[in-house]
């Protein structure tokens, strides 16, 4: 039976969006680029198969799911696995399948803690387990201008990969000499220009996702601030401690004036 985890998703040891995607991709040998892609439920099903072999009917999981009713079917399989292993967590299927960042990010933060509490370190070949299937991306989760080619995962005979339970890595695209390969036969540089444009598109998507993550956490902090303000006159030491943390700044940090820095930003 599974070890249940009841901690909330708002803790200091949470992984960032990039670290979470890196953990998922390395553990399952996938190429997810957005947290929203977890809305299909397929990755969770395979993680359950990794943790508790036989708890999930993995052959019934639709890794190529692109429609909402297919996502729901995958989550039904996940729910059955939860029930079989005694997992108490209620899956908010109706929210997850909509593909919104906040709902999916909160759930995967909980799932990471659940995974860490139950993973025993055994080897697992994710590609062989899903018979070489790759996850599809719904059209609504892809930017119209993006046409990034799928990265090869290597041969099917690759050695089983051991998932990373706690290691933090970064999944941000790396810009370096190795990313641009100039074709000696192309004198006009069209291939190089196209690849550079592709890198720009990927970086723009990364910035958009980081802004979503920033707004997500800012919203939570704002809600906490409002609660503190509503109870400001109660002289609660715990409440005061929370307020102190909310308004604390790093040593040497100076809040910029509204007048001067604007010109500098425009010049930059």
Curated annotation (Swiss-Prot):
Domain-level remarks: Composed of two functionally independent domains. The N-terminal domain forms a hydrophobic cleft involved in microtubule binding and the C-terminal is involved in the formation of mutually exclusive complexes with APC and DCTN1.
Family annotation (PROSITE patterns): CH, EB1_C
Source taxon at top rank: Eukaryota
One GO biological process term: non-motile cilium assembly
Region of interest (DCTN1-binding), ranges: 208-268
Residue span of region Disordered: 146-191
One matching Pfam family: CH
GO terms under cellular component: cell projection; cell projection membrane; centrosome; ciliary basal body; cortical microtubule cytoskeleton; cytoplasmic microtubule; focal adhesion; Golgi apparatus
Residue numbers bearing the Phosphotyrosine modification: 124
Interaction with SKA1, as annotated region: 232-255
Keyword RNA-binding on entry: no
Record GO terms (molecular function): identical protein binding; microtubule plus-end binding; protein kinase binding
Protein name (record): Microtubule-associated protein RP/EB family member 1
Keywords, alphabetical: Acetylation, Cell cycle, Cell division, Cytoplasm, Cytoskeleton, Golgi apparatus, Microtubule, Mitosis, Phosphoprotein
Localization per record: Cytoplasm, Cytoskeleton; Cytoplasm, Cytoskeleton, Microtubule organizing center, Centrosome; Golgi apparatus; Cytoplasm, Cytoskeleton, Spindle
All copies of domain EB1 C-terminal, residue ranges: 185-255
